[in-house]
Regions:
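Active-site phosphate/pyrophosphate-binding segments
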Residues: 156-312, 402-419
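Extended, charge-enriched "interface" segments that sit outside catalytic cores
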Residues: 1-67, 329-337
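Generic C-terminus detector
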Residues: 378-419
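A short, well-structured juxtamembrane/interface segment
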Residues: 53-70, 234-247
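Helicase-primase coupling helices
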Residues: 288-373
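Short helix-loop-beta junction
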Residues: 91-101, 151-154, 273-284, 357-361
Length: 419
């Protein structure tokens, strides 16, 4: 069973226990709306019930196709940007390579990066592509897919199309193109915004190809769904309440801080989830990320003594991820006081010291998980999606649209001569 808890440390006298509890109570109405799922957002709530896109029949379909691919594949190139790759990439980077390597493409317009991609592919024997796009007008995955199709045609000849799986919206131009070309197809859920697709084929299929336990992910998400939908003693409500209280007090930036470097990509997923969902109508917190202990040497001074615009949310892993004990080489280097200590212990002391110092300036929100595995990631994905929905209702914005992101795209397409 997965474990997740929420608490806060505050030695800045910002929160009083009574004030926080009163605000949580005020927000119960928002919780109840999110627990039910609002009718006006029905066309966006395909993620709200985990079984809708991660039920038994769907899991069998993902696993069956993944098993077919795994018989020959040594490398899966996942083409996608933003919500089309962030969740899968978060799990892959955190838990490490399993059986099949995943290479991520279609997330940059850098010629240098594209050349490096093809140099890397020259080292691989049997390559498959999973192109993921809800709206196939997005430039990065579109041109990457074309470039990689050309590469596969040269490498495999007439049978190149058997190496391509697409996850597209059904009955669109791109879906029909895929069927005409003989590509294998999976549906991109039409009723889920891209950043909420962590428990759908968008994320689960490539992870299944790579050898991850997607049933454990589903199990963790289902447990979290049951917990959040059936309790008012609710960590998602507590987190949403705390962060919106801080926003209302004048804070403008939420910094998600971790002491485990392999969670870097999860931070990127979180940043898109909250940035696109909450940042509209002149409202919302700017989501940023910090990777400790390294970033303590760049951001620590600002957080301790700079503009009071920032607060922190810590994502903390309770059980050590790994172990490495510091030995001795007999040299007096000034570090004998930590001889024999485990790096995990030292890292945890740094975490506790950071909380102690930073919480004297602002409240530190703390989300604690027991360990890093597929079940925990399923739980985390659902928790943050649910909490984000609550936060957006409290803030007074529609969580599921992102019209603002089209502004730069429209200018870019015009400059490139798109008709």
């Amino acid at each position: 069973m997965s474990f997740l808890s929420f608490r806060y440390e505050d030695h800045s006298n910002f929160f009083s226990e009574e004030c926080f509890k009163a605000r949580v109570k005020e927000n119960i109405d928002y919780l109840e709306k999110v627990q039910e799922g609002e009718e006006k957002y029905a066309s966006f709530l395909g993620w709200h019930r985990v079984d809708e896109w991660a039920g038994e029949e769907w899991l069998k379909r993902y696993e069956s196709l993944a098993s077919e691919i795994r018989k020959e594949c040594d490398t899966l190139v996942v083409i996608g940007v933003g919500g089309s790759n962030q969740a899968a990439r978060a799990v892959y980077e955190a838990l490490g390579k399993k059986d099949i390597e995943i290479i991520w493409a279609g997330n940059t317009l850098s010629a240098h990066s594209v050349n490096k991609l093809f140099e890397k592919l020259e080292e691989k024997k049997n390559i498959y592509i999973n192109c993921i796009a809800k709206n196939f007008e997005t430039l990065e995955p579109g041109i990457a897919f074309r470039a990689l199709r050309c590469y596969l045609q040269k490498k495999y000849g007439e049978n190149y199309n058997s190496h391509i799986i697409v996850t597209f919206t059904e009955n669109t131009y791109s879906w029909k193109m895929a069927e005409e070309q003989g590509y294998k197809t999976l549906p991109f859920p039409i009723n889920i915004p891209g950043r909420f697709t962590s428990l759908s084929p968008v994320c689960l299929f490539p992870l299944s190809v790579a050898g991850f336990d997607i049933r454990a992910m589903k199990r963790g998400a289902m447990e979290m769904e049951h917990k959040l939908k059936n309790s008012t003693d609710n960590p998602a409500l507590a987190y949403a309440t705390a962060r919106t209280m801080l926003k209302d007090s004048g804070k403008t930036v939420e910094l998600l801080s971790v002491f485990e470097p392999s969670l870097f990509r999860f931070e990127k997923w979180w940043k898109q989830l909250f940035g696109e969902s909450e940042g509209k109508d002149g409202k919302g917190l700017l989501p940023m990320d910090a990777l400790y202990s390294e970033d303590l040497h760049s951001l620590g001074q600002f957080l301790q003594d700079g503009s009071p615009s920032v607060f922190e949310t810590f994502l903390h892993i309770k059980d050590p991820v790994a172990s490495f004990v510091l030995g001795s080489d007999g040299v007096e280097d000034g570090f004998s006081y930590i001889e024999g200590m485990d790096f995990s212990y030292i890292n945890n002391v740094a975490y506790e010291a950071t909380i102690s110092a930073h919480s004297k300036r602002f409240p530190c929100l703390i989300i604690e998980i027991k360990k890093m595995d597929e079940e925990t990631f399923g739980s985390l994905f659902y928790f943050f999606q649910f909490a984000c929905y609550i936060s957006c209702l409290i803030t007074g914005v529609n969580p599921f649209i992102q019209d603002g992101v089209e502004a730069y795209k429209n200018d870019m397409f015009r400059m490139l001569g798109k008709k």
